[in-house]
Amino acid sequence: MSSIRVIAGRFGGRLLDAPRENNTRTKPMGERIRNAMFNSIGNEINGAQVLDAFAGTGAVGLEALSRGAAHVTFVERDKIAQKILSNNVSSLGVQNEAKIISAPVNSWIESGGAGKYDIIFADPPYKNPQFSTVSKLFGLLKPPTRSEERRVGKECR
């Protein structure tokens, strides 16, 4: 098992489990990218309902919780990544602030089980970027208030 760290917030510096590169299709988003993304979001994360689609190890959603999100829904279909994600949620003690959905993102959206979210993160597998599924995620955003704007972040490597 490898590890990555939570960058900032209440869990800043804590290590999260991550798979060894050869053991899974999951590759956590790099620390520099996560840091830049969360610096861009700033205080919008405070109290937010967040969706971490294609969650992998949960590094992005757990960073969101660390920085003040109220709740994160993680959606991940890979069984190895799900186990690591579940262990990471437990190790930080955020079971009441997190919900893990074990399903492909597209199937979960189409099942009607998805709610509405303030912020959505999508980091699909590089070899299967699932652009049509990512575009469906826009429909899960809560409508912004007059003073808000919505941003969408998707990492393409």
Annotate each predicted stretch with a short phrase:
Residues 1-151, 157:
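Class I S-adenosyl-L-methionine-dependent methyltransferase catalytic core
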